């Protein structure tokens, strides 16, 4: 490429350093893209693809976007998974000798967005790094827009699902990873890519190496040991965090001083919620529409600030298990709930506070604007009133918040004295600095103002001297100041006028006097713009030294905002303060579903009681027809427990919650086609996770276990699950089913209790009463529900005929007596021999064989097919 033009050679030299990024190459007022980058951007952004001479035989494909409008275009590209390298002109064009110097100042990726226009204000934008070794996983993730940085490791009971679950909680926008075993077994990364749609990036192995990673963290925090940060020497989070810092250095190309703290945590210090539970309980978004409205977050979010909204989301995604911390939150909510006037005052102040966390990030980044600093000043002005209000409330939490909220008086004063209230968005266009802040700025502005007055006086003088009443003196950036004369008055133009430009309707002229005045005006304006810019940078750097204080205040305001939100919701919806304890009991009186009752008419929602423990009522078997409300009730219990453990009041008239370490849910039927799993396979995989990981302190929600297979297989599995849970786990379990045979287990297996949803029959119609009561029901009302769903009448009539026929032929499945079950368990031993139960289950297999023979169409069966069927039947009977 010896024939390339100098500019294009410069482009290629820079592009070679960023082969995986779209290079936005600054040329004047535009960012230009060339060759393959141009073709990609043209397609993705739907902009015109043109060409440019580059020294080669063919023109270089090219497209471009205006630099002042680039943000929206970059957002579209990054949202589609592209990296964008921003290449700026790094020297003044007027002082450049030859080609102006250019260099990449930042690489923008999905996980490194900082522009608030591109971010959800109430959701963190995380970049995650994962290190997979043969001993476990290390995770580190950061939101560079706020400075939040976290690290953890997974070492005990290592399973990829634990990694998936933690990723499901954090939901990063971008993932860096290195898995030691990936070449031997790519299963883990395959699982991640199939499960999530965020941008994944296999990163350099050496950046995860122990010593390199350790030094990256030490260098950033300027420490000699990581123990003070919360890491033990072999913590796998070190490897992940070290690679994360290296990636940030190479893409952001600046010190990220607002990332000044790392939160090293254990995944066991909060309630564990696997990815299925988060989805099934619709904690932050609904299953169908993926929207916040209709989720628990949508109900609880009365926050007024962006920081508060993000903190609320974090609390919902990671409920507490420490009753001391939970009760402190609940006490704070109680005190705020009682202070009606103060809550209103807080709301008025909170809603006027800017996003201080992301503002601190922009200050550190150097991307803060004059208007941002005005927003900071205005936000700080409301802090004294918030502090005064909190000082009126007794309580440890509020005393702590008062200590943490720093009004930053000197920062407020600095901005008030230095930055104009109506300052422009850009820091490079002047009009920023307050009068009286800097003597030279004032003098230059006066000179510029006087110059404009001279222009007005000159315009009036030239009109008189020339006799041209329409004469005007105008200005543009290309020609500067000029005298404009219309075509009809050209004969009156004085001879000393110098023609500058001819247009269709007028001529433009200059005079020596005009050029002299122009020189004074423009010289003063250029100087003041440059000086104001430097003064703005000076103010910004002074504030940058207070970033830690701004972040501390932001966190305190966020916590206050969430507590306010909880208090407001409790007051509006008659939520009560739950009693949190370390017992193994859950007692809820007149509990209500927090989302459903607010979505529909509050008065029409039917409350229900719940009692569960680890001994006498650990397994609640719930029967009732479809649409009766079984799933709503079970989700309701789970949500009330979760709300209590994040420190929120709950929808009930009374609630006593023993701390729950995990919530499991197996709800609904959905094929996981992307991973080649059927409905039943998904169901069994989720069930295996529950049976393997539930504890006596877990809450388990099981909806229709076994319905993804044949009736007898499904019943067998459901029955076995109940036995296993009761014998080995003792978890508090809500188990809804249409297998009415399972209700016979009450009184035969300790802890099993039957409940049903009341239904009222009115002739052929049914009315769902939504009330959960003790006891079982033997009717499913399936045909009545089908009628409500709108099935054709002839189909319903035929279904009723078939049902009557089947009921006549029905053979009861025998549930063994309590003594038989106990004997069966004793005979199991370590070998898990299930012969005791198998005697009863044999009838299931015989019935299945009979059904297979009965359904055989002999007229369509060939001799060869018949022989094969006989062989299979003989084989199945022999195994019984």
From Swiss-Prot:
Keyword DNA-binding set for record: yes
One matching Pfam family: MutS_I
Molecular functions per Gene Ontology: ATP binding; ATP-dependent DNA damage sensor activity; damaged DNA binding; mismatched DNA binding
Keyword field: ATP-binding, DNA damage, DNA repair, DNA-binding, Nucleotide-binding
Record carries keyword DNA damage: yes
GO biological process: mismatch repair
SUPFAM superfamilies: DNA repair protein MutS, domain I, DNA repair protein MutS, domain II, DNA repair protein MutS, domain III, P-loop containing nucleoside triphosphate hydrolases
Binding site for ATP: 624-631
Family the UniProt entry places it in: Belongs to the DNA mismatch repair MutS family.
GO cellular component assignments: cytosol
Biological classification of the source: Bacteria, Bacillati, Bacillota, Clostridia, Peptostreptococcales
Recorded coiled-coil stretches: none
Function per UniProt: This protein is involved in the repair of mismatches in DNA. It is possible that it carries out the mismatch recognition step. This protein has a weak ATPase activity.
Protein name in UniProt: DNA mismatch repair protein MutS
Lineage top rank: taxon: Bacteria
């Amino acid at each position: 490429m010896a024939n390339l033009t100098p500019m294009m050679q410069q482009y290629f030299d820079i592009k070679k350093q960023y082969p995986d990024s779209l290079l936005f190459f600054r040329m004047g007022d535009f960012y230009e893209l060339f060759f393959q980058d141009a073709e990609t951007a043209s397609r993705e952004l739907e902009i015109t693809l043109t060409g440019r001479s580059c020294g080669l035989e063919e023109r270089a494909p090219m497209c471009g976007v205006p630099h002042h409008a680039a943000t929206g275009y970059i957002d579209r590209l990054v949202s589609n998974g592209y990296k964008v390298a921003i290449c700026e002109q790094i020297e003044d064009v007027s002082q450049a000798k030859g080609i102006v110097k250019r260099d990449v100042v930042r690489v923008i990726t999905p996980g490194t967005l900082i522009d608030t226009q591109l971010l959800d204000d109430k959701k963190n934008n995380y970049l995650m790094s994962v290190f997979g070794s043969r001993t476990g996983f290390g995770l580190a993730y950061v939101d560079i827009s706020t400075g939040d940085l976290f690290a953890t490791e997974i070492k005990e009971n290592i399973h990829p699902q634990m990694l998936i679950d933690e990723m499901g909680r954090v939901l990063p926008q971008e993932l860096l990873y290195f898995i030691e075993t990936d070449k031997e077994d790519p299963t883990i990364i395959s699982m991640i890519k199939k499960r999530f749609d965020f941008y994944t990036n296999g990163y350099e192995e050496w950046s995860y190496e122990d010593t390199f990673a350790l030094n990256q963290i030490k260098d950033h925090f300027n420490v000699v040991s990581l123990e003070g940060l919360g890491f033990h020497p072999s913590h796998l989070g070190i490897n992940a965090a070290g690679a994360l810092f290296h990636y940030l250095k190479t893409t952001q190309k600046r010190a990220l001083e607002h990332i000044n703290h790392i939160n090293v945590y254990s995944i066991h210090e909060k309630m564990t919620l696997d990815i299925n539970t988060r989805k099934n309980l619709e904690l932050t978004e609904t299953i169908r529409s993926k929207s916040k409205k209709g989720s628990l977050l949508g109900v609880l979010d009365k926050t007024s600030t962006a920081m508060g909204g993000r903190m609320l989301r974090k609390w919902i995604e990671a409920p507490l298990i420490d009753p001391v911390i939970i009760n402190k939150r609940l006490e704070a909510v109680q005190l705020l709930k009682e202070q009606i006037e103060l809550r209103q005052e807080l709301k008025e102040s909170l809603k006027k506070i800017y996003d201080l966390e992301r503002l601190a990030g922009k200050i550190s980044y150097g991307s803060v604007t004059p208007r941002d600093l005005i927003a900071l000043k205005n936000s700080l002005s409301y802090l004294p009133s918030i502090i005064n209000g909190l000082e009126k409330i007794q309580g440890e939490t509020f005393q702590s918040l008062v200590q943490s909220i720093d009004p930053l008086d000197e920062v407020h004063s600095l901005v008030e004295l230095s930055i104009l209230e109506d300052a422009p968005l850009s820091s490079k266009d002047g009009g920023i600095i307050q009068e009286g802040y800097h003597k030279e700025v004032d003098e230059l502005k006066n000179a510029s103002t006087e110059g404009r007055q001279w222009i007005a006086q000159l315009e009036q003088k030239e009109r008189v001297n020339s006799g041209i009443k329409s004469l005007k003196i105008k200005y543009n950036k290309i020609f500067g100041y000029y005298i404009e004369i219309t075509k009809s008055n050209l004969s009156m133009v004085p001879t000393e006028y110098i023609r500058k430009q001819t247009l269709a309707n007028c001529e433009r002229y200059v005079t020596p006097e005009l050029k002299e005045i122009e020189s004074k005006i423009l010289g003063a304006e250029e100087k003041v713009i440059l000086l104001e810019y430097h003064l703005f940078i000076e103010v910004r750097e002074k504030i940058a030294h207070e970033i830690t204080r701004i972040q501390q205040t932001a966190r305190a305001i966020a916590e206050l905002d969430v507590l306010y939100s909880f208090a407001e919701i409790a007051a509006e919806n008659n939520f009560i303060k739950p009693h949190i304890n370390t017992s193994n009991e859950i007692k809820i009186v007149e509990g209500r579903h927090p989302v459903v009752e607010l979505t529909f008419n509050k008065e029409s929602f039917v409350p229900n009681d719940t009692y569960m423990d680890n001994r006498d009522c650990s397994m609640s078997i719930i029967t009732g027809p479809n649409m009766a409300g079984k799933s709503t009730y079970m989700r309701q219990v789970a949500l009330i427990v979760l709300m209590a453990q994040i420190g929120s009041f709950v929808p009930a008239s009374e609630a006593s919650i023993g701390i729950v370490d995990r919530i499991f849910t197996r709800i609904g039927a959905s094929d996981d086609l992307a991973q080649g799993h059927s409905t039943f396979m998904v169901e069994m995989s989720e069930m295996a996770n529950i049976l393997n990981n539930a504890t006596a302190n877990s809450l388990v929600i099981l909806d229709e276990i076994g319905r993804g297979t044949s009736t007898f297989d499904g019943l067998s599995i459901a029955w076995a699950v109940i036995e296993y849970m009761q014998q080995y786990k003792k978890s508090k379990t809500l188990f809804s089913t249409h297998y009415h045979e399972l209700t016979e287990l009450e009184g035969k297996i300790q802890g099993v209790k039957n409940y049903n949803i009341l239904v009222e029959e009115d002739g052929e119609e049914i009315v769902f009463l939504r009330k959960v009561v003790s006891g079982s029901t033997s009717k499913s009302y399936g045909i009545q529900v089908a009628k409500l769903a709108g099935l054709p009448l002839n189909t319903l009539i035929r279904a009723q005929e078939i049902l009557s026929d089947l009921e006549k032929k029905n053979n009861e499945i025998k549930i063994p007596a309590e003594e038989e079950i106990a004997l069966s368990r004793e005979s199991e031993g370590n070998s898990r021999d299930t012969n005791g139960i198998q005697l009863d289950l044999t009838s299931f297999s015989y019935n299945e064989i009979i059904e297979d023979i009965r359904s055989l169409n002999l007229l369509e069966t060939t001799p060869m097919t018949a022989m094969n069927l006989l062989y299979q039947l003989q084989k199945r009977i022999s195994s019984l």
